[in-house]
């Protein structure tokens, strides 16, 4: 963690970056897992992180913040609360109790599906979609597609971390979804 002299201004992005733990070779050899639990354990880091998102979206005239299962559920409801807007969960298949719409997407080995309640938002609602991290972009793209199928205007995709070497943020931008991330890490 970088040290600063007393009274020196804090660089919020550098501070957030320093609070994320890297776990080598998890969940499989060669993967550098970016663990946000250390960031969440620090009241100061959590406050700074939430403030960064709130400052970005306070004037965006949002109706909802959508969070992607599972780690997107951690930060998205806090940001929604701070912005005084609703929270929309986008869950893994089979986890929502009411009528749903689903969207499948490809993974490196296989595929996955996410769902949203069919009444989660209405045409014209302005929504941002949040997750902890953007890697390949598949989950966020599927979430964006679900929200658009309900008629929502997806204003932006937001995450704490970008892994640009995996191409997800570029894929999302090329598909017309603006992306905001607080920090990035090289590699995967």
UniProtKB/Swiss-Prot annotation:
GO molecular function: adenine phosphoribosyltransferase activity
Keywords: Cytoplasm, Glycosyltransferase, Purine salvage, Transferase
EC identifiers of the protein: 2.4.2.7
A Gene Ontology biological process term: adenine salvage
Pfam families: Pribosyltran
Superkingdom of the organism of origin: Bacteria
Zinc-finger found in the keyword field: no
An example Gene Ontology CC term for this record: cytosol
Pathway given in the UniProt record: Purine metabolism; AMP biosynthesis via salvage pathway; AMP from adenine: step 1/1
EC class (word): transferase
Compartment list: Cytoplasm
Reactions the enzyme catalyzes: AMP + diphosphate = 5-phospho-alpha-D-ribose 1-diphosphate + adenine
Family membership: Belongs to the purine/pyrimidine phosphoribosyltransferase family.
HAMAP family xref list: Aden_phosphoribosyltr (MF_00004)
Role according to the record: Catalyzes a salvage reaction resulting in the formation of AMP, that is energically less costly than de novo synthesis.
Subunit structure: Homodimer.
Protein name in the entry: Adenine phosphoribosyltransferase
Recorded name of the encoding gene: apt
